[in-house]
Swiss-Prot record:
Gene name tied to this protein: clpS
Quaternary organization: Binds to the N-terminal domain of the chaperone ClpA.
Protein source organism: Salmonella typhimurium (strain LT2 / SGSC1412 / ATCC 700720)
InterPro entries with a match to the protein in the record: ClpS, ClpS_core, Ribosomal_bL12_C/ClpS-like
Protein family per UniProt: Belongs to the ClpS family.
Name of the protein this chain belongs to: ATP-dependent Clp protease adapter protein ClpS
Stated role: Involved in the modulation of the specificity of the ClpAP-mediated ATP-dependent protein degradation.
Record-linked Pfam families: ClpS (PF02617)
Length: 106
């Protein structure tokens, strides 16, 4: 019977390991922050180009950024969120706009 208990313990250990390995990844909010210089049209362009929003939804989010100071553009895994933040910030700098994109844990 000792062997049966060993197998049960092993099975439980495997289940625990698999459960831990299959936990959903941490998610992060990608946020655009308002400033007084970036044109609204550029913000709409960013939302369409990097977040695949249609012009209507991009306009709604741009207005949220403008009037509320910031808006969530999407929620992604850490790697995707970090990549989007870096791409948006790089694109803004290349176009000489101070638009800031950040991330925070969801």
């Amino acid at each position: 019977m000792g062997k049966t208990n060993d197998w049960l313990d092993f099975d439980q250990l495997v289940e625990d390991s698999v459960r831990d390995a299959l936990k959903p990844p941490s998610m992060y909010k990608v946020i655009l922050v308002n400033d007084d210089y970036t044109p609204m049209e550029f913000v709409i362009d960013v939302l369409q180009k990097f977040f695949s929003y249609d012009v209507e939804r991009a306009t709604q989010l741009m207005l949220a950024v403008h009037y509320q100071g910031k808006a969530i553009c999407g929620v992604f895994t850490a790697e995707v969120a970090e990549t989007k933040v870096a791409m948006v910030n790089k694109y803004a700098r290349e176009n000489e706009h101070p638009l800031l994109c950040t991330l925070e844990k969801a």
